Design a protein with these regions (language model features):
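Short beta-strand edge/turn micro-motifs at domain boundaries
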Residues: 126-134, 138, 142-177
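Amphipathic alpha-helices that form helix-helix packing interfaces
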Residues: 34-37
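Short, charged low-complexity linear motifs
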Residues: 19-21, 120
């Protein structure tokens, strides 16, 4: 069993007979796993503190993201200035759990008490072992508060057939005045 402070979630592992072509079902499963990981990060923080949350977030980054494939394009919802785009794994980790001097503006999106994450597809594009998805992701916190963001993910299957996030872009919906 993976080390994840007791708040594990399933990662996508393809079997040997799976096609290299990414399916819509795999995209849906990847979004569900990502949401489950975010909830696991929140619960580990609430129950065991920042070190446990960091452990779960590291596991999520290792299993869901493609940092071992090359540059992951990561743009968090609430980021700006010189740190708008996170070009390193450390930058992505800081966004999820905060508590780092290198990213003082990050309060830790993953430790906001999330209880549910639901995605709604606007469109997806699949070309073999690469896929892109965009839509809305709704987060519900422990008090019933709702946050809805515009989200895009890009995925690539690695050599083992595991779907990995290589693009993560999130923004708040446009609010006309």
């Amino acid at each position: 069993m993976p080390v994840c402070a007791g708040y594990c979630f399933t990662s996508i592992i393809a079997d040997e007979e799976m096609s290299s072509e990414i399916t819509e079902q795999e995209l849906a499963t990847a979004r569900k796993i990502w949401g489950d990981a975010l909830v696991a990060i929140s619960k580990s923080f609430e129950n065991e503190g920042i070190d446990a949350a960091r452990e779960v977030a590291n596991y999520a980054l290792d299993t869901a993201y493609g940092f071992d494939l090359g540059q992951v394009l990561f743009k968090p919802t609430m980021a700006g200035g010189e740190q708008t785009f996170r070009t390193t794994r450390e930058g992505a980790l800081a966004y999820f759990v905060g508590h780092t001097d290198e990213y003082p503006g990050d309060s830790g999106f993953g430790i906001k008490g999330w209880r549910s994450v639901v995605s709604e597809t606007a469109a997806s594009f699949v070309d073999g072992d690469v896929a892109m998805w965009m839509g809305w992701v709704t987060f519900i916190d422990k008090d019933g508060g709702i946050t809805k963001v515009d989200k895009s993910w890009g995925y690539k299957k690695d050599e083992a057939g595991t779907l990995r996030i290589v693009l993560h872009h999130s923004s708040l919906p446009y609010q006309p005045e």
